[in-house]
Amino acid sequence: MFTLRVVLFVVLLCISNFLVAADPWLTIEGNDGLGKGQHIVFVTGEEYYRSEEGMSMFAKILSQHHGFKCTVLYSIDPNTGTINANRNDNIPGLAALREADLMVLFARFRQLPDSEMRHIVDYVNAGKPVVGIRNTTHAFRYPPNSSSPYKAWDFQSKDWPGGFGQQILGDTWIAHFGKFQKEATLAHVNATQRGHLVLRGVADTIFCHTDVNSVERLTSNDVVLFTGQVLSGLNATDPPVTDQRKDTRMPFAWFKTYTAPSGKQGRSFTTTAGASLDWINEDLRRLMVNAMLDLTGHTQKIPTKTMVDFVGDYEPKPTGALSDEVWTAAKLTPQSFGIKSK
């Protein structure tokens, strides 16, 4: 009987540990730093740019180097419990936004259940700060016959022109200005904003593997920090294109003061960079972290050269959509992106 009790205790303990480890999101407690006592929630869900890698990497940097508690949410296949960015209808853990000091959103064409979507809507309606990355300009898509109360957040909305992207970030999806996976980006600092505190320690140019996106609807009130130039190839040494696009640079990184549907105002920061390979660039990482420090109230304390070293290994995967079979075989869980014990 004693042996049986021991066996049952061990089994229950293993089950308990499994359940604790099986949360469909990743939470990393913060060390000491400017962000001590604050909470950043990263919301991922897009098929091309490995947002699950890049945002998990930033969560490690912000928590370990700067003190923020960080939670990363993922698109989860409820049938397997693993990450599958093709599942556009399930991002568990969005209730964490209730206590978030900053939402970092990296999503594309999500159609979330109203019970999940309302957490994003409530967060924005509170006028809280938002960071939008790459295809977050078209984060949400609803079918024409949708009865959702959040249908107006669709990237093609006519009722709330351009939906979330245009109204909160500054623009919705238009087109690739550079050729997708064929032409990289060289971003140039806006000389009139060189003294902006978010640009502390950031170089005048930033190379990105991703192509330039068209951005055409920013206003004179939006603050553009960098503009993107189309390169003729995918290497930093490739020259700019020489066709009709040669003299056009698109907004690459900017701040906006938005007005939410509630009437409250808030601030957002957006960049059209975002592939996991892009974050290899230290200056781009510093720009992002500085922007997050700014949006969480630490503008005057942004360091001369903000620490953005990787925490652990960072081995980004190439850009491109993956099949459901590939996602299932990968068996990635939120804990796959946690801080590994040495």
Predicted region positions:
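N-terminal secretory signal peptides that target proteins for export/translocation
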Residues: 1-4
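Helical hinge/lid and interdomain linker segments adjacent to catalytic or ligand-binding clefts
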Residues: 23-32, 41-43, 47-140
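Catalytic beta-strand/loop cores that center a nucleophilic Ser/Cys/Thr
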Residues: 25, 63, 69, 88, ...
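Nucleotide donor/acceptor-binding cores
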Residues: 38
